């Protein structure tokens, strides 16, 4: 694992074989859980806070994939995240959004982010999924930890986004773009209480060809 802070970004020295992940830190304590899980899987991770880099500089780093961390705000307050999601879509750069990052994916394509029916803080939920994308090879349902007060509104979900996981009541817990390598999970795979967190991240790394 190689960790880098918010110093001036360095382009990948070998564009053809670049395997670096760019993780956007939305000022959340779970960010480094994600970093450590990715490090367990052998990934090189560059970390930048959401207001300490612009989209042009982020894309100039030529990341093999982008991860949008959880955070305490909504997508409109998450620095470059919405614009970076659009840039990832334009360049077909694989992206994984976690919690706030998942909501950002939904909003970036026209979905609405609304108040959840209940605020959850460390609540376990059963994830019912289709076995695709980051959920490939996982049992359904499985238990995962939730910390959120916002959700992507199912009624406003655009056709280009597919629901890949949900709670029993239909609350969206996972999204995937139908044509692009863009994924989101509302829960926290990086929580020690979530089942199969490493495997979900490995599935994303397989997508961006970052070796374990």
Predicted regions and their residues:
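Cysteine-nucleophile active-site neighborhood
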Residues: 19, 63-137, 141-143, 201-203
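N-terminal beta1-alpha1 ligand-phosphate binding loop
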Residues: 21-38
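Short hydrophobic/Thr-rich beta-strand motif most characteristic of the beta2 strand and flanking loop
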Residues: 44-50
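Short amphipathic alpha-helix with an adjacent loop that forms part of the alpha/beta core around
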Residues: 54-62
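Catalytic beta-strand/loop cores that center a nucleophilic Ser/Cys/Thr
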Residues: 131-179
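Acyltransferase
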Residues: 191-212
């Amino acid at each position: 694992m190689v960790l880098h802070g918010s110093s001036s970004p360095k382009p990948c020295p070998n564009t053809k074989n670049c395997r670096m992940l760019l993780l956007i830190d939305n000022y959340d304590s779970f960010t480094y859980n994600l970093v450590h899980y990715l490090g367990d899987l052998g990934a090189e991770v560059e970390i930048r806070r959401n207001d300490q880099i612009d989209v042009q500089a982020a894309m100039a780093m030529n990341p093999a994939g982008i991860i949008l961390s959880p955070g305490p705000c909504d997508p409109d307050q998450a620095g470059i995240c919405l614009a970076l999601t659009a840039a990832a879509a334009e360049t077909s750069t694989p992206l994984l959004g976690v919690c706030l990052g998942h909501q950002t994916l939904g909003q970036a394509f026209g979905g609405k982010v609304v108040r959840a029916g209940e605020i959850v803080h460390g609540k376990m939920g059963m994830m019912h999924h289709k076995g695709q994308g980051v959920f490939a090879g996982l049992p359904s349902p499985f238990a995962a930890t939730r910390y959120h007060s916002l959700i992507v509104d199912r009624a406003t979900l655009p056709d280009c986004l597919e629901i890949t996981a949900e709670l029993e009541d239909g609350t969206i817990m996972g999204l995937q773009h139908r044509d692009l390598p863009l994924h989101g999970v509302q829960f926290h795979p990086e929580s020690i209480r979530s089942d199969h967190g490493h495997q979900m991240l490995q599935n994303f790394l397989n997508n961006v060809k970052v070796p374990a």
